[in-house]
Amino acid sequence: MNLLPLLAATFWVSSLVYAQTPDPAPNAGGGQTVITSETLDLNLNKTKGPKQGLFRGNVKVDEPRFTMVSKEMTVFFAEDDSVENVEAREEVVIKRKDGTSETWSEKAVYNMKEKKLTLLKVTKQPKAISQDKTVFADKIILFPEEDKMLTEGASRVMLQKAP
């Protein structure tokens, strides 16, 4: 199995948490990214349906800077087998290992072309938590490369004083 598409998917995941607080230095130590799940259904033959990889059951991404867990994660591929979008569903939690931020959502979609992470409400609002604030909204849109956040729908911010 060609692991290049899966490695590209891990880039998406690493950008999720990077959006919360920029790293002062890139991950120069290399390190290993491990994606585990109970099952993986990978289809790169477009004649047999959409080109995608579907991770199901206790999905966990462990990367030097963060961890992500969800119940399911789908990686969608373009004609050239590059990753177009990644979608994590059900109890999506992303935590930086340095403890500076985390996100919680029922659905998270990362668009590779737009470099945009969207946290979506299914039945409850997603939230993005940093050391001094928590943001809740029907939709939270993060742009990792621009250190920018937008919200849509009902939104609120809770500010906490630093200890």
Residue ranges and their predicted role:
Residues M1-P163:
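Mature-chain termini and adjacent capping regions
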